[in-house]
């Protein structure tokens, strides 16, 4: 019987520990926090979006960070396996918009309880408040880890599942990346992924709190004509810039050392010609009104003063005096408001980290290190990341399962 130490008790670490124990290993799970799954507890706004019901083959379209590396993991331990894992314990799940799967209770604590119960059932020794402060090598293998700078724990095999560097208050402080580098692994550039964006346009703060639905955004690098990212959905203005599902997904394509613009199409369902006809119809209806009072049926009230300002049409101009050229400019504006990106919000605010242990140095079919023979990795510590929708938690569980299966 091997002794296995798993570092980090997020979903990846817990699944790795459960699976390693089922494979007849003596397993210790070390967690720096005072409880299991601290970051998992806040995912999905505390409801825990645990996976997605889309066909597993579709998952890769939602994984911008090294999707090919995850083929073995996601096909070995699928979303169906995740659903069966929890439902076999009596934890009911439900699917919502976009295929996102949540516990029926809407409580992330149920998901953590399910994992915790399996840890107990499989006799995993869980050590909370146990922060790994050093890893010791001997003859090219890990011999032991130091815990809380106080004592050493020896084992035959080790799994690092410490997460990235986003949400540091949950314990994701990058310790596992530091240890991995010490062990000879390359750490790819760390960037925030799924994070709000700060905008230079001063008027944005006047729209703070406004949510725009059914819009289209396109993100451009100023050096490239083709958009880096384009999608439709929901967006939120904040005091510093923009957020919401569309922006979080789009942030994956932005770095802090480039020049980017975000174009907003407020009416993606209408062509320029169709929008022009719609505006003419409204102008005919409000023929004797001032321009500022003619857009109520077309745009959110809070947005109208900004559109008027950007259109350079006098707010007091009668709509029957607005000429064709002005109307054309208004159409182009509504179909293409340009936001100038200042920077991404800090990595601490990101939902996940882009970057991590280089996937070229990990066997994708086992999660084993190609450098250290008694080491595997699982979860966000690896250079993989996905969009929101349950994909990141599924990746954590799938890589954890592979790592635990191959100790």
Residue ranges and their predicted role:
Residues 127-129, 134, 305-385:
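A glycine-rich dinucleotide-binding beta-alpha-beta segment and adjacent secondary-structure elements
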